[in-house]
Amino acid sequence: MAAWSPAAAVPLLRGTRRLPLLHWAQRMFASQTEAELKVTQILKEKFPRATAIKVTDISGGCGAMYEIKIESEEFKEKRTVQQHQMVNQALKEEIKGMHGLRIFTSVPKH
């Protein structure tokens, strides 16, 4: 049996480094995950006047971190912190199982 050498490990390292990129590329073209769809549905119910809702799992697919972008008339005349509190309240049960959440809110421009 041949002894281990750093040169022998190079192909393994190359493959390992490419895996996250490959996973990211596949994820970019995939439809929403079940968890993303669930969060989207909850937000649609809580913000019926929303003109745009986008939920993205930014944790690499494990469901620990999400980015939420939501545009709704319900946010009109509210400060950003109040808008984010509304989203947090709507997702209070789901947030318990998350590591983190990035929220971007806006009011539609007419």
From Swiss-Prot:
Spans traversing the lipid bilayer: none
Subcellular localization, as worded in the UniProt entry: Mitochondrion
Pfam families in alphabetical order: BolA
GO CC annotations on file: mitochondrial matrix; mitochondrion
Keywords: Mitochondrion
Record's keyword annotation contains Translocase: no
Protein family per UniProt: Belongs to the BolA/IbaG family.
Entry-linked PANTHER family: BOLA-LIKE PROTEIN 3 (PTHR46188:SF1)
Protein function: Acts as a mitochondrial iron-sulfur (Fe-S) cluster assembly factor that facilitates (Fe-S) cluster insertion into a subset of mitochondrial proteins. Probably acts together with NFU1.
Protein name in UniProt: BolA-like protein 3
